[in-house]
């Protein structure tokens, strides 16, 4: 499976998970909203050029509402600190992301493979006090 398609599927499946399950995908003490949006920005380029080759034009059209919504949140100054607050995944804004991701997931026929594999396969602590 193509790198971008595989990672897009993981990302959509992750965003479609119930918020309490997002903690299982990332290392302890991670800023979940920030990590998820960093992944989003790496996989889905602003102009959709990275995923355009792996999705049909119709699939892109179904993806655009989610993409536009996420981008609208990125530019909101009142949310600038929310990306570093894990409570944000329980907000109404995140619920819209969750719902739209579930809708796109269903449209694509992607099943959530629970448990979804963690984002990182290994965590290396550089501070000996962390475990």
Regions found by a protein language model. Name each.
Residues 1-47:
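Short terminal alpha-helical segments
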Residues 105, 116-126:
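Eukaryotic acidic, Ser/Thr-rich intrinsically disordered low-complexity regions
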Residues 49-109, 113:
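Amphipathic protein-protein interaction modules
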Residues 37, 124-131:
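Eukaryote-specific, cytoplasm-facing alpha-helical/coiled-coil scaffolding segments in long proteins
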Residues 19, 27-28, 33, 53, ...:
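Proline-rich intrinsically disordered, low-complexity coils
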Residues 10-12, 97, 124:
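Generic signature of intrinsically disordered, low-complexity, basic-rich segments
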């Amino acid at each position: 499976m193509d790198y971008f398609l595989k990672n897009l599927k993981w990302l959509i499946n992750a965003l479609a998970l119930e918020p309490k399950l997002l903690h299982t995908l990332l290392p302890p003490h991670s800023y979940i909203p920030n990590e998820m949006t960093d992944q989003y920005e790496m996989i889905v380029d602003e102009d959709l050029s990275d995923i355009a080759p792996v999705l049909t034009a119709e699939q892109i059209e179904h993806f655009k509402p989610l993409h536009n919504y996420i981008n609208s949140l990125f530019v909101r100054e009142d949310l600038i600190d929310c990306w570093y607050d894990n409570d944000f995944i329980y907000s109404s804004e995140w619920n819209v992301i969750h719902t739209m991701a579930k809708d796109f997931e269903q449209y694509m026929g992607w099943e959530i493979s629970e448990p979804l594999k963690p984002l990182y396969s290994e965590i290396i602590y550089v501070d000996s006090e962390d475990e």
